[in-house]
């Protein structure tokens, strides 16, 4: 989904059951400051996830004819994290549950190594490509650089990606 393949391409891919999301997410979404989230509007002037902010609000027809989210994930790690996470947090706060997925654009953006941005998916049984993709769609994954691991992460006994995996508090409080 890059750079301007838009909702029409998402419709075409989702009708086939694809897992889809924009690449190079942060380009064009630069914001001043270093707080997350912040209320500084990005310029939307690059090749990144500029269309994501609109596409995430749509549902499209899936392979079985039912409506599914037009965007499954937002790619992370290969552009400045503040720019990527800022737009993701804002869409999460608006109620859209888009997942994140690691991305490496080796050697175009970074020549450091293949696998700079990785998606780790918690699977119950044998690894297959389809199960791995479904794990991202369900949110049973985290993104990392290979140096830290959170595969058993949970809050208040709620595992990531199980059910709606949202933790709701009636008022500010501690989570464990």
Residue ranges and their predicted role:
Residues 2-114:
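Domain-core and long-helix interface of multi-subunit machines
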Residues 10, 15-19, 25-30, 87-176:
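C-terminal functional module detector
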């Amino acid at each position: 989904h890059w750079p301007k393949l838009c909702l029409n391409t998402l419709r075409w891919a989702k009708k086939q059951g694809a897992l889809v999301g924009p690449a190079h997410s942060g380009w064009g979404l630069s914001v001043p400051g270093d707080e997350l989230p912040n209320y500084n509007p990005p310029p939307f002037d690059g090749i990144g996830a500029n269309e994501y902010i609109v596409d995430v609000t749509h549902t499209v027809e899936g392979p079985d004819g039912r409506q599914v989210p037009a965007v499954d994930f937002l790619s992370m790690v290969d552009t400045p994290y503040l720019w990527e996470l800022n737009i993701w947090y804002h869409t999460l706060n608006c109620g859209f549950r888009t997942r994140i997925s690691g991305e490496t654009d080796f050697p175009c953006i970074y020549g450091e190594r293949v696998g700079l941005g990785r998606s780790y998916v918690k699977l119950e049984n044998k690894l297959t490509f389809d199960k791995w993709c479904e794990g991202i769609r369900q949110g049973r994954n985290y993104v990392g650089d290979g140096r830290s691991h959170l595969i058993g992460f949970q809050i208040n006994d709620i595992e990531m990606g199980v059910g709606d995996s949202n933790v709701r508090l009636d008022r500010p409080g501690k989570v464990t």
